[in-house]
Each structure stands twice: as C-alpha cells, then as structure tokens.
C-alpha cells in the first residue's frame, strides 16, 4: 500500500525532521501539533487553554488543506506536560466536536518539545 506525503501549507514549520501529515489506505496521520502559530511562528502563551486552542486550530487548518475536517478524525492522542491540565484541555477539545467524539488516549508526557504544555496528534479517515 503506497504512502503519500500531502502538501500542508497551513501547518506550522516543523521543529524536527518530520512531515506534518502522511496518508495511506484512506487514513491521514497528522504529526503532533503544538501551540505554534503557523503565520507568525510564535508560540501561544504559556497557558494550557490558549495552547490547546492553537493546537486545535492547527489541526483544523491542516485537515482543511487535505479536504477534511474535525468530523473526519477517528483517533487522537493527547500528550500533556502536566496531567493536572486534563480538565482544561478536555473543555477546549470538546468545543471542536459535535459528537460522537473520536477514540482518544491522553497521557502525561512529562516534558514536551520546546516546553509546550499540550501536543495532539490525530488520525483521520477519508
């Protein structure tokens, strides 16, 4: 089964050597998104709510580049620097879906790249 790396002009500039998205077998895999504004390259404030909104906006923009939306997400993995932010991130996350929600895993990662507070990766289906 062939893999493709689609164009994602709305994705923030990568912080490491990876593609923002990859597609195979009708599934689209988005690399973890952090609270980085793709237009300015600036990070969202050091507040988990602000960062979570930026993360979800980034996810929506990248999915939009691929002709997809939040309703196409089938699985998410949420990484938190601090599990005490679980409820705040849940509130933001839930506001982007009408339900039913995608399958999901949430873990405390301890430390995230560049001291971000939240990172979310998604799998979407065509």
Predicted regions and their residues:
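Short, polar/acidic, helix-capping and beta-turn segments at strand->helix junctions
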Residues: 2-126
């Amino acid at each position: 089964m062939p893999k493709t790396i689609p164009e994602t002009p709305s994705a923030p500039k990568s912080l490491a050597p990876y593609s923002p998205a990859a597609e195979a077998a009708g599934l689209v895999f988005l690399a973890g998104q952090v609270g980085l504004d793709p237009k300015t390259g600036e990070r969202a404030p050091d507040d988990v709510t602000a960062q979570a909104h930026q993360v979800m906006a980034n996810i929506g923009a990248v999915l939009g580049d691929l002709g997809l939306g939040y309703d196409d997400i089938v699985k998410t993995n949420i990484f938190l620097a601090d599990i005490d932010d679980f409820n705040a991130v849940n509130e933001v996350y839930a506001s982007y879906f009408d339900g039913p929600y995608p399958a999901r895993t949430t873990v405390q990662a301890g430390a995230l790249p560049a001291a971000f507070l939240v990172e979310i990766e998604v799998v979407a289906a065509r």
